[in-house]
Amino acid sequence: MCLAIPARLVELQADQQGVVDLSGVRKTISLALMADAVVGDYVIVHVGYAIGKIDPEEAERTLRLFAELERVQPPASEPMHGMNIHQEPA
């Protein structure tokens, strides 16, 4: 499954690069597919590339949903429903 996430563009860099902020985490991404992106835009990031812009209200709503999912979903390192994916089958 592939997942693209909204992130706010906080810095433009040389060579069609930019820095995005996602809940305090900053990451350098490629803006090669988004020539018109400006600081302050919310962009959709997929595998290190900005692939589109998103309305700020929609971006905030999506980020709130991700935060809620994180609160109710167990961490990936915890077994789900008593199962341990690292155990050998019996």
Curated annotation (Swiss-Prot):
Pathway: Protein modification; [NiFe] hydrogenase maturation
Keywords, alphabetical: Plasmid
InterPro entries: Hydgase_assmbl_chp_CS, Hydrogenase_HupF/HypC
Cytoplasm as UniProt keyword: no
Record GO terms (molecular function): carbon dioxide binding; iron ion binding
GO biological process assignments: protein maturation
SUPFAM superfamilies per the UniProt record, alphabetical: HupF/HypC-like
Family to which this protein belongs: Belongs to the HupF/HypC family.
Protein name as it appears in the record: Hydrogenase maturation factor HypC
Gene (name only): hypC
